[in-house]
């Protein structure tokens, strides 16, 4: 459960720039990014009564300071509860710790900083949900306080989780038992989270500026040896990636990605921009992130007027931005009993809180359109329809939420005088007498 908070403006007078205090403040701000982390602002509460839910925990600790998030979990024997409370500021966490040994109900609670208790887990099966991860820890008798999955809004391939457990010992035990565990052909990676020991990202070449994207290639130019010969003069090439499916669909504007061993080589290769390769003028630029192609395909489909293409796809909506294509595929196979061969592709449409599912043919898509509408997915009713249906639903939801926004004080003040004038109009009208009514109805 998340709670909003408002920062209190600083009312103190500004320090002189040359003063020692100002120098210390500058140093503190410079290091703020390093020191601002959940471990400083998050506390663990042990031995809460079984009746305590998120709301009760929030009410009990809200006087300590603004609260961002509260999680509650049962102990293994279910005889008491844990709570994880994330405050907006460090002083809120300090105030909460002063409540340790207080009696809540009939239980004496223990409050402490939640440090070195966060796990980083990755490479679990794509179909895994929070429940699967929670069950995984429960199987080794460890309580998961909270499980945080990444948003897939801009990158649908992200697959990791941050998991808070109740002690350092449990965190180390999880690493011992789960790191390297084989699950459905995937080797699980589990580590104690440490911001100072970040693993190298899979898209590091893109972020380091060592990867280029070559556009406007013909299908004949989609040859790794040809591309290597054309670009190896600029520096050592680490690898070349040619996205699949371009030759099969006879795209007129194909592309390829090339990773150099260093940034300077990639920048020199930009000289090839707008040069001729074969009989085509190619475009060369530093590569965008990997989701570039997928987002481009989504944009193309959203604007498409090709009726034959549109007849083979349906949209599912509304969906959370943490739902992956793998989870949707699993749902279609296990709950709707669709054969994986009948699904050509699943694309997330984060701009409209939905997904596009492309099927093998239009008849099958029409059948699925009727079957999937109103079905249950992750405890919620979802709709199915065309791209226009998804857009219309999203826009209606946006308009509906706008209607429920309370008018501001300024708007009320502006409308006030007009309302008063309208109320005075009836008072100015003269009341009709009996003679007036006789003339109106009897014509006298």
From Swiss-Prot:
GO cellular component, one term: U6 snRNP
Location of the protein in the cell: Nucleus
Domain RRM as annotated: residue spans: 41-116, 117-195, 210-289
Entry-linked InterPro entries: LSM_interact (IPR008669), Nucleotide-bd_a/b_plait_sf (IPR012677), Prp24_RRM1 (IPR034397), Prp24_RRM2 (IPR034398), Prp24_RRM3 (IPR034540), RBD_domain_sf (IPR035979), RRM_dom (IPR000504), RRM_occluded (IPR031766)
Pfam families given in the database record: Lsm_interact, RRM_1, RRM_occluded
Domain of life (superkingdom): Eukaryota
SMART domains recorded: RRM (SM00360)
Residue positions, PTM Phosphoserine: 19
Disulphide bonds in the chain: none
Record region (Disordered): 1-29
Keywords: mRNA processing, mRNA splicing, Nucleus, Phosphoprotein, Repeat, RNA-binding
GO BP term (any one): spliceosomal tri-snRNP complex assembly
Record-linked CDD domains: RRM1_Prp24 (cd12296), RRM2_Prp24 (cd12297), RRM3_Prp24 (cd12298), RRM4_Prp24 (cd12299)
Amino acid composition bias (Basic and acidic residues), ranges on this chain: 1-16
GO MF assignments: RNA binding; snRNA binding; U6 snRNA binding
Subunit description: Monomer. Interacts with U6 snRNA SNR6 and the LSM2-8 complex (small nuclear RNA); to chaperone formation of the U4/U6-U5 tri-snRNP (small nuclear ribonucleoprotein) assembly, the protein is displaced from the U4/U6 snRNP once pairing is complete.
Additional facts recorded: Present with 672 molecules/cell in log phase SD medium.
Protein purpose: Functions as a recycling factor of the spliceosome, a machinery that forms on each precursor-messenger RNA (pre-mRNA) and catalyzes the removal of introns. Chaperones the re-annealing of U4 and U6 snRNAs (small nuclear RNAs) released from previous rounds of splicing, an initial step in reforming the U4/U6-U5 tri-snRNP (small nuclear ribonucleoprotein) that can reassemble into another spliceosome complex; this step involves binding U6 and facilitating the unwinding of the U6 internal stem loop, followed by base-pairing of U6 to U4.
Protein name: U4/U6 snRNA-associated-splicing factor PRP24
Source organism (scientific name): Saccharomyces cerevisiae (strain ATCC 204508 / S288c)
């Amino acid at each position: 459960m998340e709670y909003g908070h408002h920062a209190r403006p600083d009312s103190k007078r500004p320090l002189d720039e040359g003063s020692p205090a100002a120098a210390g403040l500058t140093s503190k701000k410079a290091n703020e990014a390093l020191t601002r982390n959940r471990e400083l602002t998050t506390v663990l509460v042990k031995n809460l009564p079984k009746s305590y839910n998120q709301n009760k925990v929030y009410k009990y600790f809200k006087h300590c300071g603004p609260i961002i998030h509260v999680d509650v979990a049962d102990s293994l024997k279910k005889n008491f509860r844990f709570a994880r409370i994330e405050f907006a500021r460090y002083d809120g966490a300090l105030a909460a710790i002063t409540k340790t040994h207080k009696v809540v109900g009939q239980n004496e609670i223990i409050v402490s900083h939640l440090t070195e208790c966060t796990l980083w887990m990755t490479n679990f099966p794509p179909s895994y949900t929070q429940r699967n991860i929670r069950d995984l820890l429960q199987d080794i008798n460890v309580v998961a306080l909270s499980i945080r999955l990444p948003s897939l809004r801009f990158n649908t391939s992200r697959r990791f989780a941050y998991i808070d457990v109740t002690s350092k010992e449990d965190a180390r035990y999880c690493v011992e038992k789960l790191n390297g565990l084989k699950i459905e052909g995937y080797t699980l990676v589990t580590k104690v989270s440490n911001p100072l020991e970040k693993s190298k990202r899979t898209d590091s070449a893109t972020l380091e500026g060592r990867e280029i994207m070559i556009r406007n290639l013909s299908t004949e130019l989609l040859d790794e040896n040809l591309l290597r010969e054309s670009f190896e003069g600029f520096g050592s090439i680490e690898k070349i990636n040619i996205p699949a499916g371009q030759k099969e669909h006879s795209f007129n504007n194909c592309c390829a990605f090339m990773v150099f061993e260093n940034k300077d080589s990639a920048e020199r290769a930009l000289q090839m921009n707008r040069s001729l390769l074969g009989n085509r003028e190619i475009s060369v630029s530093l590569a965008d992130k990997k989701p570039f192609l997928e987002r481009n395909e989504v944009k193309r489909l959203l604007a498409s007027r090709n009726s034959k293409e549109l007849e083979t796809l349906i949209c599912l909506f509304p969906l959370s931005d943490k739902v992956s294509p793998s989870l949707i595929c699993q749902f279609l196979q296990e709950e709707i009993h669709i054969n994986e061969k009948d699904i050509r592709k699943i694309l997330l449409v984060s701009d409209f809180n939905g997904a596009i599912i492309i099927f093998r043919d239009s008849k099958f898509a029409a059948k699925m359109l009727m079957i999937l509408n109103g079905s249950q997915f992750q405890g919620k009713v979802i709709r199915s329809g065309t791209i226009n249906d998804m857009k219309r639903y999203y826009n209606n939801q946006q308009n509906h939420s706008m209607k429920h926004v309370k008018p501001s004080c300024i708007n009320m003040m502006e409308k006030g005088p007009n309302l008063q004038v309208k109320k005075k109009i009836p008072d100015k009208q003269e009341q009709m007498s009996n003679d007036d009514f006789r003339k109106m109805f009897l014509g006298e």
